[in-house]
Amino acid sequence: MKRVLISGADGQLVTDIIKVLSTPENDMFFNVMAFNRKRLDVTHKEALEIEFEKNNPDFFIQGASYHVVEEINKNPKEACDVNIASLHYLTELCNKYNCTLINFSTNYVFSGLKPPPEDFQELDHYNEIDDPSPVNLYGILKYAGEQILSTSCEKYYNIRVSGLFGKTGSRAKNGSNFPYTIKKNLELSNSADHLEPVKVVADQIVNVGYTVDLAEVIVKMMRQEKQNLYGLYHLANKGECTWYEVAAKVAEVLGYGEDKITPIPTDEFYTNLKRPKDTSLNMWKVENRFDVEIPRWDDAIERFFKNEVL
């Protein structure tokens, strides 16, 4: 039985990973020890050393992250400690204990300015061999964390995710996420006091990731662990989309008309922080190496509301 040590256990992605690890088909293979940040602070090396010595894990899932883009510029020291210093500690400990480190990065390591493909055989979305070029501090810190793993960690999966949404919501956003926010704003816009449509950015191209779908893939990666499969992967629901398109899909699922969502440019919504325009990811590598099929984003939005919200 593989021992799995998890930090950031109350995060929306990690919550679903724990659920999948605990299903009857998986719990015979994994013994899970999960900690929220109050119980295990990954910025304290001594605390990590105690848990590694006590549990001798086969996997460490680094679910603790400082990822609210707007807040990072206000608290760069804390963001560096969580997103960079912790990975120095974890890499050292994982190497010492022959443990596989699972870390989560972001589509924001890219500038969003990838040139269009010259012919149909080339990949038009960002793939794992494209060079990162982050445009804000969040992307810079996450890319720095990636480099620690790629240069120093012996066994790791570094997984770039994008636009996460799940039942738990983001702890850093008080249990909210993009679909929840759109649902709330649609309800407000439908009230007598707020008849204006919901404004949503329409010129950023991304992927979104339903945490249930992503958790299923991550656990399959753990089940199929082999030396030649370690490395960097992109993981989100398939199909590029704009935030406006996601919001329109949420409105459709909830029974609202198209007129309830209004597209706006990024500059009208975000005035102080640069964001990349097109960070859509290619999932070919993870699908082919682990023989998985990732659902499309619009299907994921429908299932999210049907299974976990409505």
PLM segments and residue spans:
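N-terminal Rossmann NAD(P)H-binding glycine-rich loop of SDR-like oxidoreductase domains
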Residues: 2-23
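SDR active-site strand-loop-helix element
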Residues: 7, 35, 60-64, 101-107, ...
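Adenosine-cofactor binding site in Rossmann-like domains, unifying the SAM/SAH pocket
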Residues: 31-48
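NAD(P)H-binding glycine-rich loop region in Rossmannoid oxidoreductase-like domains
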Residues: 45-82, 93
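Catalytic helix-loop patch of NAD(P)-dependent Rossmann-fold dehydrogenases
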Residues: 81, 85-89, 109-159, 163-166, ...
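NAD(P)-dependent short-chain dehydrogenase/reductase
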Residues: 147-206, 212-213, 219
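Mid/C-terminal beta-alpha module of Rossmann-like enzyme folds, strongest
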Residues: 196, 217, 224-270
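Conserved C-terminal active-site "lid" loop/helix of NAD(P)H-dependent oxidoreductases
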Residues: 242-248, 264-309
